[in-house]
Curated annotation (Swiss-Prot):
Family, per entry: Belongs to the protein kinase superfamily. CAMK Ser/Thr protein kinase family. SNF1 subfamily.
Record-given protein name: CBL-interacting protein kinase 8
Catalytic residues as annotated in Swiss-Prot or TrEMBL: 136
Functional description taken from the UniProt entry: CIPK serine-threonine protein kinases interact with CBL proteins. Binding of a CBL protein to the regulatory NAF domain of CIPK protein lead to the activation of the kinase in a calcium-dependent manner.
Lineage: Eukaryota, Viridiplantae, Streptophyta, Embryophyta, Tracheophyta
Provenance organism: Oryza sativa subsp. japonica (Rice)
Amino acid sequence: MVGGGALRRVGKYEVGRTIGEGTFAKVKFAQNTESGESVAMKVVDRSSILKHKMADQIKREISIMKLVRHPNVVRLHEVLASRKKIFIILEFITGGELFDKIIRHGRLNEADARRYFQQLIDGVDFCHSKGVYHRDLKPENLLLDSQGNLKISDFGLSAWPAQGGALLRTTCGTPNYVAPEVLSHKGYDGALADTWSCGVILYVLLAGYLPFDEVDLTTLYGKIESAEYSFPAWFPNGAKSLIHRILDPNPDKRIRIEEIRNDEWFKKNYEPTREIESEEVNLDDVNAAFDDPEEDADHTLDDEAGPLTLNAFDLIILSQGLNLAALFDRRQDYDKLQNRFLSRKPAKVIMSSMEVVAQSMGYKTHIRNYKMRVEGLNANKTSHLAVMLEIFEVAPSIFMIELQRAAGDTSDYNKFINNYCSKLDDIIWNFPIEKSKSRISRLSKR
C-alpha cells in the first residue's frame, strides 16, 4: 500500500503523495501492484502539449527515451493516458540530488568529482547517440541512486513547454549552466550545448560554486558569452585544462564528447559504464497515449479535500533510511531537515500563518485545499522563484509541512527556506528529541 488517505489508482499503479512539482507537471510516488516496484509518476496536462503544438515532438522524444537503457539515465518504464492527462512512469531514485550533496558537504574531492563527471559523460553521450539532447543539464537534474551512482533525469523531456510559452526550459530558468549560443536565442547544436553544461557542472563539483554567478543578468550574460571566469588555487591542473577546452564560447571550437573521453585527466581510473543489454521494447503504449486516449475511471487524480494522512510506510520513504529524528529536531538547519517541519496547530491555522508570512515577504500565494504555491522574484529581483507547500497529518493533531522547489535556482530556494521558516516560530513544534527517538525506534521495530 502506498500510503494513507484516499488511495488512487492509475492502471496497475497505486498512486500516493506528490514528491515534486514543476511548471507543467507533477511527480507522484506510486507503486506497481503487480511487482511491488516503487516508481515515480510524472503527471502532465494534455492541454499544455496541445496548446504549444508539440505533441509530435514530445511523442518522438518519449518513444526514444523508452528505448534508452543506460545505467546513468533515469529509466522510462511506460506511458499511460486519459483524455486530460498523460502519465509517464519513471524509475524511482532514492539518493537525492547531487546538488544537495554539494550544499551539505561542500566541494567534492578530485576522485569523486571525476567519477561523477565520467558517469555524466557516459549517460549524455549515450543519449546523444540516440538523437536526444537534454538542454537543461545542471546538478539539480543529476540524481544519485542507493549505491551512489549518478542518474540523469528529464533526458528527452526538457523541451516540453514551460510556463510563459517558452519552448526550451533552458531559456526561462536559471542561465548559469547554459551555453552562450542558447542565451543568444540563435540556432544551436544540442550536443555542444549539453557539453558546455557538463563543463560548468565539473567546475561546480570541484570548486563548490559556480564559474558564472552575478547579481544582475546583464553582467551574468556578458561573462558567459565571453567565458570570463577564474579558478580557485586548489583546482587540479588537469581539470583546468579540460574545462578551458569545454567552456569555449565559440561552439565550433568547443571540445566534443569524443575528445573529452581522450583527455588524460578524464581517463584516469575510468571504467566505462557497462551498457544494459538490449531488450525488445514495445511502443504501443506511447502511440495509444497520443493517438487515441480513452477515459478510464481509474485514471483520475483529484486533489484531496483535506490533508493527506501519512502512515509509517510514507514516513520511511521520506526519511531515506529511517532517520526520522530530523523531522523533530529544530536545532538542525532547514536544509538538513529536508525542508520539512512539524506543527500541533490546526491545519487551517497553519495554512493561514504560512500565507501571511509569504505575503509579508512580497510573494504571491495560491491556495487549493491544503496545498499552497508561493511565487515571485528572488531576493535579488533577478529571477523567478516558486515554492510548493503541503500539509500532511502524521498523527492525530500532529501535522507535517513539506516545502519543495517548483521553479527557480536551488540556492535562491535555500535562502528563501531559511528566511521563511525563521518567521514561522509560532507554528513550528519543538518536539523533545529523546522522546522522538524512542518513538521512532518502536516504529522501526514493528
